[in-house]
Regions:
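Polybasic low-complexity intrinsically disordered regions
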Residues: 1-170
Length: 170
């Protein structure tokens, strides 16, 4: 049995690490919770049950309710022509929170997709999802740089190749 690492045809600086995805996902979820608290302070009721994991469907529902509320506010503002209209500042605040929630929702979807791509690995390349980052022998600067690669295992018997396999793990 002989093994060698073959470089993938992928950009060596296009890596995605599992630990970073998990860390950024936690930060994103805490930011979403703080945005929902801001919505509650703006008198927009969007209570989440305690110890509930945020899902994309929950955020879709909240954003849809927020858009409907904004439509109602727009109609109310068009009817009333008060100069210092408090509804305008409320609308401004709700629009800002809706935009931020949509941004966080896209990030949540991105992290969910990344977690699905990982499988059992700890890294993958953005340009070649099957490649895993490994240390390879062709390291010209001898600094232990990681590059996207595949692990090729070859089984031989009396100098004849009997089997081979390409794996993602080093």
């Amino acid at each position: 049995m002989d093994g060698t690492k073959i470089l993938a045809d992928a950009n060596k600086y296009s890596f995605v690490w599992r630990k970073n995805t998990i860390r950024f996902d936690k930060l994103n979820r805490s930011a979403i919770i703080s945005l929902l608290e801001e919505l509650n302070e703006a008198k927009f009721k969007c209570q989440l049950p305690a110890e509930t994991d945020l899902t994309l469907e929950m955020l879709d529902e909240i954003i849809l309710r927020l858009e409907n509320n904004l439509k109602d506010l727009n109609k109310k503002i068009e009817k009333e022509h008060n100069s210092p209209n408090p509804d305008k500042s409320r609308r401004r605040k709700l629009k800002s929170l809706k935009r931020k929630l949509k941004l966080r929702q896209t990030k949540l979807l991105e992290y969910k997709i990344q977690t699905g791509i990982y499988g059992k690995r700890n890294s993958y390349s953005k340009t070649d999802h099957d490649a895993t980052f490994m240390r390879v022998k062709e390291d010209s600067m001898l600094n232990g740089q990681l590059k996207p690669a595949y692990n090729l295992q070859i089984a031989t018997s009396k100098q004849f190749v009997t089997a081979f396999g390409i794996f993602q793990n080093p």
